[in-house]
Amino acid sequence: MSLRCGGAVRTVGPRVFGRYVFSPVREVSFLPDEKKEFLQSGPDLQEFISGNLADKSTWDEYKGNLKRQKGERLRLPPWLKTEIPMGKNYNKLKNTLRNLNLHTVCEEARCPNIGECWGGGEYATATATIMLMGDTCTRGCRFCSVKTARNPPPLDANEPYNTAKAIAEWGLDYVVLTSVDRDDMPDGGAEHFAKTVSYLKERNPKILVECLTPDFRGDLKAIEKVALSGLDVYAHNVETVPELQRKVRDPRANFDQSLRVLKHAKEVRPDVISKTSIMLGLGENDEQVYATMKALREADVDCLTLGQYMQPTKRHLKVEEYITPEKFKYWEKVGNELGFHYTASGPLVRSSYKAGEFFLKNLVAKRKTKAL
């Protein structure tokens, strides 16, 4: 699985789910007008990456350990504690989801960027990430808390149509379609992905569609089916450096197979934008991160996101290290030097983020113009 409140103030600490952190905050209506306006309009990508929503003055004073010692459980550093800006469209989108029985990674994972992505804005791209093919995965990666089963429930045949209907109602500019792994199906769910993209493009040819797919067990025909479905961005996450694949991911997944997925998508659709993501803080070293980034760029991957791994439950892999915002900024610089068209690197950066989609929207438009 490759995945992405309100009311009174609560005193509990942040919740974590997969690679996301959620800190309950005050309802926007209780805030001063100036602060309310700032939260509703939302910061841009660089502001969020650098953590301007948190009190940066406390960062240098932080004395907690950033690397885990044996038997220790690391405390959350201040740069991972941040408010969640809620846009005006939040409740509308949430109600639409309920009525159509759709799941989003944004909600399931309690992503801290949900208010910004769903809210859109004058200079933003209203974005949502829909999780297809149910909520039960056939794999058991050690970083992910999505429930697993050997034989999940059958697919909802109406899901592709309902997804297209939801996007039409929302008026989104950019949608990310992702899914659980479905090794129980002959094509891994590739046809389901392709149908959903087709319905979306029929209803709104201008909508930009990103598919964040499983590895389809390395089935090239399945990869082709999705790549040729009319999508604009093909994403598949390698998750971590090659040396930690067996420790972090299900045994059926591996770095070389994931790299082949990304390569093959570009081979059958040279104009498609390819994208992947790496979690940091699992015990990797700098040399391994650099070598991984280099291998991805050599495979012609266009866009890369790097974010902090967050332990979802005590049963999952512990965080080995909290990476500082400065180190994330360093990796962003390295990504740019290696030639990625877009590198988003920061503690709270995830595979899908509104300012990232805004950039990708412009990149897609440029490539389409060049192809004409």
From Swiss-Prot:
PROSITE patterns assigned to the protein according to its UniProt record, in alphabetical order: RADICAL_SAM
The name this protein goes by in its record: Lipoyl synthase, mitochondrial
Domain Radical SAM core, chain residue ranges per copy: 122-341
UniProt cofactor(s): [4Fe-4S] cluster
Record keywords, A-Z: 4Fe-4S, Iron, Iron-sulfur, Metal-binding, Mitochondrion, S-adenosyl-L-methionine, Transferase, Transit peptide
Origin organism lineage: Eukaryota, Metazoa, Chordata, Craniata, Vertebrata
Name of the gene encoding the protein in the UniProt record: LIAS
Enzyme class, broadest EC rank: transferase
Location of the transit peptide in the chain: 1-27
Species in which this protein is naturally found: Bos taurus
